[in-house]
């Protein structure tokens, strides 16, 4: 945001990684869900799923293949976008090893985040018969995991006022959120 990093002695990659991490939590799950929500439900609607399942390919192999392919697409987009952004920032403003480590960590965690939400989207697609239903559930999942979950935790921490929930339950609930 505006004024981010004012008075902080960190290189551009470290500051950019922090900014992009915030943005990534919103966009990567949404992109992964949009990419994967109709992978199986859409094929069932179009009539191509029975054809794919008529081959000697097992259901789990089809699911795994779609997961790997869609995760590769999300990962490639992340890698290309972040490499261009980070490379440009580093070339224009310089970098330090700590910033490079932060940048690589950002890429790795963003790819993992994308993979989790591709898997969720495929699970939704596999469990619904229509792509419209899968789309509605996928958007609902995004809303719950990315927006409402954190708001509910924040409200619970405020209501707890530093009590047992904040000290012992809250850290585990933060880790339980895939976003």
Regions found by a protein language model. Name each.
Residues 1-2, 22-33, 137-152:
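Hydrophobic alpha-helical transmembrane segments of multi-pass membrane transport/permease proteins
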Residues 4-24, 64, 69-128:
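Secretory targeting signals
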Residues 19-42, 74:
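Long, hydrophobic alpha-helical segments
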Residues 33-53, 67:
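Transmembrane helix boundary and interhelical loop/hinge segments in multi-pass membrane proteins
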Residues 111-163:
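A structural motif at transmembrane helix-loop-helix junctions in multipass membrane proteins
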Residues 32-36, 84, 120, 149:
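Hydrophobic/aromatic residues in alpha-helical transmembrane segments
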């Amino acid at each position: 945001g505006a004024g981010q990093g004012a008075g902080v002695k960190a290189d551009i990659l470290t500051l950019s990684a922090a900014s992009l991490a915030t943005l990534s939590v919103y966009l990567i799950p949404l992109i992964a869900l949009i990419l994967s929500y109709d992978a199986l439900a859409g094929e069932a609607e179009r009539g191509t799923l029975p054809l794919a399942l008529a081959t000697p390919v097992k259901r789990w192999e089809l699911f795994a293949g779609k997961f790997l392919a869609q995760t590769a697409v999300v990962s490639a987009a992340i890698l290309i976008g972040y490499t261009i952004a980070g490379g440009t920032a580093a070339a224009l403003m310089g970098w330090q090893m700590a910033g490079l480590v932060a940048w690589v960590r950002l890429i790795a965690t963003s790819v993992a985040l994308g993979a989790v939400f591709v898997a969720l989207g495929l699970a939704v697609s596999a469990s619904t018969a229509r792509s419209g239903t899968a789309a509605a559930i996928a958007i609902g999942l995004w809303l719950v995991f990315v927006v409402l979950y954190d708001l509910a935790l924040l409200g619970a921490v405020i209501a707890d006022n530093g009590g047992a929930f904040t000290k012992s339950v809250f850290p585990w609930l933060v880790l339980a959120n895939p976003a």
